[in-house]
Design a protein with these regions (language model features):
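Secretory targeting and sorting signals
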Residues: 1-22
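Loop/turn elements at helix/coil->beta-strand transitions in domains of secreted/extracellular proteins
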Residues: 26-31, 55-60, 71, 84, ...
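Long, internal low-complexity/basic segments
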Residues: 26-28, 35, 271, 277-294, ...
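A short aromatic-rich beta-strand->coil structural motif
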Residues: 30, 36, 113, 125, ...
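Active-site segment of extracytoplasmic enzymes that catalyze sulfate/phosphate-ester chemistry
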Residues: 32-33, 39-121, 132, 150, ...
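Active-site-proximal cap/lid insertion segments
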Residues: 40-41, 150-181, 195-204, 209-376, ...
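Short, solvent-exposed turn/loop segments enriched in Gly/Ser/Thr/Pro and often Arg
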Residues: 45-46, 58-81, 88, 122-134, ...
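C-terminal cap/loop subdomain of S1 sulfatases and analogous C-terminal strand-loop tails that border
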Residues: 143-152, 333-339, 380-383, 387-473, ...
C-alpha cells in the first residue's frame, strides 16, 4: 500500500505528462472536488487527498453553514447563508431543494467565472429535485453539464446528463449507467473535460467541479437487503465476498478493516444526561453497534474510490497545467455514527457534523510549503475564493456574505479576520410527497433529529439556541473539544447570544453585513 501511495503522489508532482497545449493559460485552472457527507474521521484513510497538503493549505476550522445537503450547497454556490438564500431544507414543499434554489442559478460562481473567460464544467450531484429530464435546462455559466438524472445514491443504477456546449448544440442527452461505479464514471468524465478544454479552449483556463455522491448512503435500503447501506465499489469490498477480485487497497485503504472500530470515535456512546432532551437517549445496544461498525468500515471503503478519482483526475494534467492549477477538496457536511448516542445522520451543530475537511493545493510558484491555518472559514467563503483565484474584481467577489480565503491559502496574514462561524438549521418536515428526501432514512429509522436551531462557533466555544427551548447549549471547546460537558449557565452565553442575534439577521435590510457580524463583542 505504501508503495502504491508513493507512486500516486510522485505522479501528481513530477511524472511525465501528455503534451501541453500550444498556449498555456496565464490565469490558474481550478479543480474543486466536493464530496457528500464526508466526515473528518474518513480523511486519514485517503492518502491521495491528504497528499494535497504538500504544497497546499489545510484549514483546521472550516465550518458549513448548515449540516444538510441543499442549504449547504446553496451557501457554497452563492456565498450566502441559508437565511439569505431561502434554501432551508432538501425539498421544494418545505422551503428547499431545487424549487428554492432555482432563482439563484444566475448568481453562482460559474457565471462570473465564465464571463472572465473560464471554460467551466460540473459533474455529479447538483441540487436535490433538479429536473434532469429530456430537454433539461443547463444553468447559466456552465460549458459542460454532467449531473445525475436519477439513481446517483445507488452508485450503480444511475443516469447522467451529458451536455458539452461545443458539441451538443440544442441536444440535451441523458446517458444511462452501463453498470460502472458512479465515482469511476465521474473520474472518466472529468478527464474528458480536461482533454476537451485543451481542444476547444486552448489558452483559456478552466474551472472543473466534481461532486460525487459518495460516501452518502443509499436511499432505497429495505429490510433483508444484502447490498450495503453505504455501497463501496466491488474492488473495495471484503475479500471474502469477492475471492477472485482485485483489492489494491486492502479494503480500508491500508489498515485491516477488522482493526477499525466505530466505538473508538470521539464521544461515541457518550452519556447525554446533560444535553437537550432531543439528544438524551439510552446507551447504544450491541446489535446497533455492530451495524454502525459495518457502516463505518463501508464508508471508509467508499472513499477509497474517491481517493482514486482525485488521483486519476490530477494525473490527467500536463506538467504546465499541474503547475498552474488550484486543487480544492471539501465536503458539503459531516456525519455521525454513534457520537453522543446519535445513531446515524447529520444536521447537528456538533463538530462531527459541521467541521469538515478543506484542503487547497496551490499552483507551483516557488516554495512548496505545507501550510496549516486555524482561521475560521466557512462554505460561504468559496464563492469569493474561486473568483479571487480567477482575478475577478473585489466589487463582485466580496458582494456576498463570505470573504476570499486566498490570502490564507497563500500564507499571508489577514488583519481582523472573522471570529465566529454561523450554523443555522431548519428541521425538515417529515412528510415525503413525491420523491423522498434522501436524508429521510434517518427519520424512518427513529434517529434523533435536532429541532430548528441557530449556533455560533468560535475558536474556543460552541453556543446553540433551539426553537421553543429557553435553555441554550454551551461548550468550552478548548477544555472540552468533544463537546461532552454542556454548561448552559456559563456566563459567556449572554455575550454569544448577542453575536448570534447579529449573525442570524446579517445581510438583511437594516442589519449589519455578515462580515461585521462575525466579530465578537
Amino acid at each position: 500500500m505504501a508503495a502504491a501511495v508513493a507512486a500516486i503522489l510522485a505522479l501528481l508532482i513530477a511524472s511525465p505528462a501528455p503534451p501541453a497545449s500550444a498556449a498555456t493559460p496565464t490565469r490558474p485552472n481550478i479543480i474543486f472536488f466536493l464530496v457528500d457527507d464526508l466526515s473528518a474521521d474518513l480523511l486519514p484513510y485517503m492518502d491521495t487527498v491528504r497528499g494535497l497538503a504538500e504544497g497546499g493549505t489545510t484549514f483546521t476550522d472550516y465550518y458549513v453553514s448548515d449540516s444538510l445537503c441543499c442549504p449547504s450547497r446553496a451557501s457554497m454556490f452563492t456565498g450566502q447563508f441559508p437565511h439569505n438564500t431561502g434554501v432551508r431544507t432538501n425539498q421544494g414543499y418545505d422551503r428547499g431543494g431545487y424549487e428554492a434554489f432555482a432563482r439563484h442559478e444566475g448568481r453562482t460562481y460559474a457565471v462570473p467565472l465564465h464571463q472572465a473567460g473560464y471554460r467551466t464544467g460540473y459533474l455529479g450531484k447538483y441540487i436535490n429535485e433538479y429536473p434532469a429530464r429530456p430537454g433539461y435546462q443547463v444553468p447559466d455559466g456552465w460549458d459542460e453539464w454532467h449531473v445525475s438524472a436519477g439513481g446517483g445514491y445507488n452508485e450503480f443504477r444511475y443516469q447522467l446528463t451529458r451536455y458539452i456546449r461545443e458539441e451538443s448544440g440544442d441536444r440535451r442527452p441523458i446517458a444511462p449507467s452501463k453498470g460502472d461505479y458512479l465515482v469511476d464514471e465521474l473520474a472518466q468524465r472529468a478527464t474528458g473535460f480536461i482533454e476537451r478544454s485543451r481542444e476547444h479552449a486552448p489558452g483559456r483556463p478552466f474551472f472543473l467541479q466534481v461532486s460525487p455522491f459518495s460516501p452518502h448512503n443509499r436511499v432505497d435500503v429495505r429490510p433483508g437487503d444484502t447490498e450495503p447501506r453505504f455501497p463501496p465499489a466491488p474492488r473495495d469490498r471484503p475479500k471474502d465476498r469477492f475471492p477472485d477480485g482485485e483489492f489494491p487497497h486492502g479494503d480500508c485503504g491500508g489498515p485491516d478493516c477488522a482493526g477499525i472500530d466505530v466505538t473508538t470515535l470521539p464521544s461515541y456512546d457518550e452519556d447525554t444526561a446533560d444535553k437537550p432532551s432531543w439528544v438524551r437517549r439510552a446507551p447504544i445496544e450491541a446489535k446497533r453497534a455492530e451495524e454502525l461498525r459495518e457502516d463505518f468500515r463501508d464508508r471508509i471503503r467508499m472513499v477509497q474510490s474517491v481517493d482514486d478519482m482525485v488521483g486519476r483526475v490530477l494525473s490527467t494534467l500536463t506538467e504546465p497545467e499541474r503547475r498552474n492549477t488550484y486543487v480544492v477538496f471539501a465536503s458539503d457536511n459531516g456525519f455521525h455514527l454513534g457520537q453522543h448516542r446519535l445513531v446515524r445522520g447529520k444536521s447537528t451543530a456538533y463538530d462531527h457534523d459541521v467541521r469538515v475537511p478543506l484542503l487547497v493545493r496551490r499552483p507551483v510558484t516557488g516554495e512548496r510549503d505545507r501550510l496549516v491555518t486555524g482561521a475560521i472559514a466557512q462554505n460561504v467563503d468559496l464563492f469569493a475564493t474561486f473568483l479571487d483565484m480567477a482575478g475577478v474584481a473585489p466589487a463582485i467577489r466580496d458582494s456576498r456574505d463570505g470573504r476570499s480565503l486566498l490570502p490564507l491559502v497563500q500564507g499571508r496574514q489577514v488583519a481582523d479576520w472573522r471570529q465566529a462561524a454561523l450554523v443555522e438549521h431548519v428541521k425538515p418536515d417529515p412528510r415525503t410527497p413525491g420523491r423522498p428526501d434522501p436524508d429521510a432514512d434517518r427519520l424512518r429509522q427513529g434517529n434523533a433529529q435536532p429541532p430548528t436551531y441557530n449556533a455560533v462557533r468560535t475558536a474556543g466555544e460552541l453556543y446553540v439556541e433551539y426553537e421553543n427551548d429557553p435553555k441554550p447549549e454551551y461548550y468550552n471547546t478548548v477544555a472540552d473539544p468533544r463537546q461532552e460537558s454542556n454548561d448552559p449557565g456559563n456566563a459567556r452565553t449572554a455575550s454569544l447570544a448577542g453575536v448570534l442575534r447579529g449573525l442570524t439577521t446579517c445581510g438583511k435590510p437594516g442589519a449589519p453585513d455578515c462580515w461585521t457580524a462575525a466579530h465578537l463583542h
